[in-house]
Amino acid sequence: MNDTPDMQSFYCAIGLGNPKSPSNVGSVVRACGCFSADHIFYTGSRYDRAEPFYTDTANQRNEIPLTHIDSLTEAPVKPEVKIISVELCENAVPLTDYRHPEQALYLFGPEDYSLSQETINKSDDVVFIPTTGCLNLSATVNLLLYDRMIKQTKVLSHIEANDLIRSSRDCRNNLIVKD
């Protein structure tokens, strides 16, 4: 019997609570493209006002839906999707110890505030990234998505890793580690 989950069973979405900075949202969109997230939801009106200044240098926005919703905990996802809040919250699980569900909606508070207690209460899990001080929103999303990827991906062979590197790097990068 094969215990490896079918990649089709994986779903990953990001929920941003009233994001303020278009550059942060642009960085989140790029991270979602790099780490194969499926959807980005956001609440509030600040991003809509800032959207003309949006930065997405990798054009990931055409690949990943970015949808305004009224409430993060009521995002239109399947019932089996777990809601995971990522917040500096007492009694939260350190990300280093967390086992990600196959299907998850990860919620992040705004750059200048936190998720609400109501959102925390409605979450299936709450995790935090052990740091001294708080991280930037896009840095937090990047770390979370990287952690999810490394914990759910099989170890790549050397050949597979090189194929991934070739398909991911900038066209001017032809670097090789010499034996």
Please identify what each model-predicted range represents.
Residues 28-30, 54-57, 97-101, 120-123, ...:
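Short, glycine/charged-enriched secondary-structure capping and boundary segments
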Residues 1-87, 149-154, 158-179:
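RNA substrate-binding interface of SAM-dependent RNA methyltransferases
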Residues 25-26, 51-53, 94-96, 116-119, ...:
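Short glycine-/acidic-enriched loop or helix-start segments at secondary-structure transitions
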Residues 34, 119-160:
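Structured adenosyl-cofactor binding patch, chiefly the S-adenosyl-L-methionine
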Residues 89-122, 126-127:
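Active-site/ligand-binding-proximal alpha/beta "capping" segment
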Residues 45-47, 72, 110-113, 130-135:
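Short, acidic/turn-prone active-site loops that include or flank metal/cofactor-
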